[in-house]
A protein has these predicted regions:
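Positively charged n-region of N-terminal signal peptides that target proteins for export
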Residues: 1-4, 8-9
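Hydrophobic core
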Residues: 9, 13, 17, 402-405
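Glycoside hydrolase catalytic-domain context in secreted enzymes
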Residues: 20-621, 626
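Short, well-ordered beta-strand elements
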Residues: 75-79, 260-266, 773-774, 782-792
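A mature extracytoplasmic/lumenal domain signature
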Residues: 83, 115, 531, 654-656, ...
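N-terminal targeting sequences that direct proteins away from the cytosol to non-cytosolic compartments
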Residues: 618-683, 736-743, 767-769, 788-805
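Conserved polar/disulfide-associated segments of primarily extracytoplasmic proteins
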Residues: 664-775, 784
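Extended hydrophobic
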Residues: 779
Length: 805
């Protein structure tokens, strides 16, 4: 279903392009050695117009292949390959690099990635607190170390270009990217972002200050209104000249620190889209001394003014953008640049300057001396080292802001029995927030290398001298309740909201239930808020809490929280922005708590010995929903999928590709992550994929549901009950997308001689309509067989059902 959603939105799936094209013969892979002794300008003089235009575009990894790189020699590739460890990342990047060296130009490429709080697309890397927490910590030295560690772990993945830091000034917490900002204080933003950038650069990485500029100053209600309407993200910043100059000082500090690239903002400034704002883009180069290159943001060229895509590409290049992050339309953009130069709509001097800047950055990064990074040096040999985790742990400790501590409930004293409750206590995805293993959020709550708050308390309870209780039935035995509430994980406009309350659309589903249950216990309550911004706190709830700690999005090291709450370190974090008491206060001088507020344990506090950090287990294996059943794994051979247990035999169309096992697990995790109630979570946790086959316009999913786990209290749970629940769940998956979901009805259908109950849906968007058929058949007391078929076009369900024999 995760891929189904992607197909519906984009009408394109991850397809191996090489399967559609003849193999490209490699050229001389050693030309980079000659280039190494030439200036960027001399190298540019050797290139054809076509080769120069290729350096100016940046495809997404899932839209290109090694053969495409070998044929065209693109300047860069970006985005994620999924849940991938450092070793696999190296293979991926090295494959593209070898192909780039064998391309007609022979220019090394550079891989770009949004490593915004550590190398967050790498499994078992260190995930630091997001920037809002770094702003609360306000520790220049540790932020510099964070940059160094991020660079070192990125190099272990051979990802040499980091789209970070975000240097936005966040002024409205309704903005979904608030947590990516260091706060609202420009001096703190300038100090910390510069320290971080220096850390990246000093360890050999290419940094990228973003998003130029005023992306955090946009006015609520002016959000971009494209295929997905946004409330505030990518909106319009209405600023005076003096306000603009203050924001530019942050970028001047980045340039002075040596930042090599700058990314343009999706947003507008006083009504002008930044991607076409030549005045300010060229100001970077002509007045502020920027010698690196300018990159556009994801697909943003399409959203500027212009009668055609051609006009928009030409306008953005002429405005001063050197590399176009046109992830899907990169080939079209490349050809437009070529034709525009020939037609004198873009000067060749403009192209030469852009490519020289791109090559300079690559040369300075050492890619012309050692493109395969064979001689690259790193401090660590693997990601996620204990040494690096300790630095992240320190930042977590310093980022915590104590809002309230009535009766000195904190720190927990030795002998205290602590009952831990609330969804934020034991969910790695919530704790790490967006941009973790995936763009919007990690699709699983159990993330390798992440120690949750609850796990930290349990792991070090003996060291702290406390007893941890997690069973609600035993809660009455506790002396104090540790209530962990917060927000769902989100990224960009998905976090835009007009309701900042803990029980609003982006609050965790059980926040209210957990708060009510904690109150009923009649014990002192310590509340930890795990969120990417200052949410609006209900006044009555706040009064009932004895202590309140703002944790922001702490990342992988939950021990930083348990250490401080158990008295191994004091609170030192301060609010990096005002904390508003209501929506009406936003943008005014009124607030609940002022910027810079933060309590400590006070005079006389003596820190206890901190327990030695223990690395998280390499994996967190959970019971599989097939355990205890007679399930057998299906087989796929010679284009035919067979599962003897369900009795299904299906001829899979040749254009469909079988998904790897890792993707099947990811799809299941994705569904579980989207559950907002206990019934959905039980059902999706009881569901597992046997096989999945996809092509660009549709596919087949074969699943099983353990009905005893899905509905343990309902022995009569059948196909109709499943489809009723699952159909409602499917509709919810598309909420917020520009898609209309229509239920077409339920009937019976035969798959391979077996009768199934079939539900049919259509999903309609700007590009057309997709049909989804969901088939269910109960096999025995334990398992139900579920088949999903989805497609675009005029075919009928019966056309696909004929493939089953």
């Amino acid at each position: 279903m995760k891929k189904l959603i992607a197909a519906t939105l984009a009408f394109a799936m991850i397809l191996p392009m090489a399967a559609c094209k003849p193999k490209v013969e490699p050229g001389d892979a050693n030309r980079y050695k000659t280039y190494a002794n030439m200036t960027p300008e001399q190298i540019v003089a050797q290139l054809t117009l076509e080769q120069k235009a290729a350096q100016m575009v940046q495809p997404a990894i899932y839209k290109t292949s090694n053969d495409d790189m070998r044929e065209n020699g693109y300047g860069s590739v970006l985005s994620t390959a999924g849940h991938t460890n450092a070793e696999e990342w190296r293979k991926i990047v090295d494959g593209f690099q070898q192909a780039s060296l064998e391309s007609p130009s022979g220019i090394p490429f550079i891989y770009g990635q949004d490593d915004v709080h550590g190398v967050n697309y790498c499994v078992n890397a260190v995930y630091f607190p997001h920037n809002i927490g770094i702003g609360a910590a306000n520790d220049e030295e540790l932020t510099y170390k964070m940059g160094q560690i991020t660079a070192d772990e990125a190099k272990l993945c051979h990802m040499m270009w980091n789209f970070s830091p975000v240097v936005a000034q966040s002024v409205d917490p309704r903005w979904g990217r608030t947590y990516e900002s260091y706060g609202s204080d420009l001096e703190i933003i300038k100090k910390l972002s510069t320290a971080y950038t220096k850390g990246l650069i000093d360890k050999g990485l290419v940094a990228c200050a973003k998003h130029f500029f005023a992306d955090g100053n946009v006015v609520y209600g002016t959000g971009e209104q494209g295929a997905t309407p946004m409330l505030i993200d990518r909106g319009d910043a209405k600023l005076s000249e003096s306000e603009i100059n203050e924001l530019l000082k942050v970028y001047q500090a980045q340039i002075d620190a040596g930042v090599q690239t700058i990314m343009i903002s999706h947003s507008s400034l006083n009504g002008v889209k930044m991607h076409e704002n030549k005045e300010y883009i060229m100001k970077l180069k002509n007045e502020m001394g920027f010698k690196g290159f300018i990159v556009s943001d994801w697909g943003s060229v399409e959203n500027i003014t212009g009668a055609s895509y051609k006009e928009k590409v030409i306008k953005s290049v002429n405005a001063g953008i050197d590399m176009l992050m046109e992830t899907d339309r990169f080939e079209e953009a490349r050809q437009i640049i070529i034709d525009a130069v020939k037609n004198k709509e873009i000067s060749e001097e403009r192209v030469n300057d852009a490519v020289a800047r791109i090559i300079k950055v690559k040369k300075d990064a050492g890619l012309f001396d050692d493109p395969m990074l064979a001689n690259m040096k790193t401090e660590q040999t693997e990601t996620g080292s204990l040494e690096y985790r300790k630095v992240a742990e320190q930042l977590v400790e310093k980022s915590l802001v104590l809002l309230k501590n009535d009766k000195n409930t904190l720190p927990f004293k030795q002998g205290t029995k602590v009952y831990i409750t609330g969804s934020a206590a034991n969910d790695g995805s919530v704790q790490c927030g967006g941009w973790t293993l995936d763009w919007n959020r990690a699709t699983t709550s159990e993330i390798q290398g992440v120690t949750t708050i609850q796990e930290a308390f349990e792991r070090y309870a003996k060291d702290y001298g406390i007893e941890v209780i997690t069973d609600a039935k035993e809660a009455s035995k506790a002396d104090v309740v540790l209530l962990c509430v917060g927000e769902q994980a989100y990224a960009e406009w998905n976090g835009d909201t007009e309701d900042l309350s803990l029980t609003g659309a982006l609050g965790l589903a059980d926040n209210r239930d957990a708060m009510n249950a904690a109150e009923k216990l009649g014990k002192p309550i310590v509340t930890c808020i795990v969120a990417g911004r200052h949410i609006i706190i209900n006044e009555d709830d706040y009064k009932k809490w004895d202590s309140v700690v703002m944790c922001y999005l702490p990342g992988s090291e939950g021990k930083g929280i348990s250490d401080v709450l158990c008295g191994c370190a004091d609170f030192s974090g301060k609010l990096p922005s005002p904390w508003y008491g209501s929506i009406d206060q936003i943008g005014t001088d009124k607030c609940f708590l002022k910027k810079g507020y933060g309590l400590s344990y006070g005079d006389g506090f003596t820190a206890r010995k901190e327990p030695e950090t223990v690395l998280d287990s390499a994996s967190k294996a959970a019971a599989h929903p097939s355990d205890g059943t007679n399930y057998t794994k299906g087989l796929f051979k010679d284009g035919v999928y067979v599962n003897s247990y369900s009795g299904i035999t299906a001829k899979i169309p040749g254009e469909c590709k079988q998904a790897p096992e890792s993707e099947l697990s990811e799809n299941r995790d994705y569904h579980i992550s989207k559950c907002t109630n206990a019934k959905d979570k039980a059902r999706e946790s009881a569901t597992f994929y046997d096989a999945s086959f996809t092509e660009s316009m549709g596919g087949f999913d074969f699943k099983f549901v353990n009905t005893k786990l899905a509905a343990p209290d309902d022995p009569a749970y059948d196909e109709n009950k499943y489809l009723d629940e699952y159909g409602t769940f499917v509709k919810g998956l598309y909420k917020g997308f520009p898609i209309t979901v229509e239920y077409k009805g339920r009937d019976k259908a035969v798959l391979g001689g077996k009768e199934y109950v079939r539900d049919t849906f259509t999903l309609s968007g700007n590009e057309g309509t997709q049909t989804i058929c969901i088939y269910a058949r109960k096999l025995d007391d334990n398992l139900m067989s579920v088949v999903e078929i989805y497609w675009f076009g005029k075919k009928t369900a019966e056309d696909y059902e004929k493939l089953f024999g």
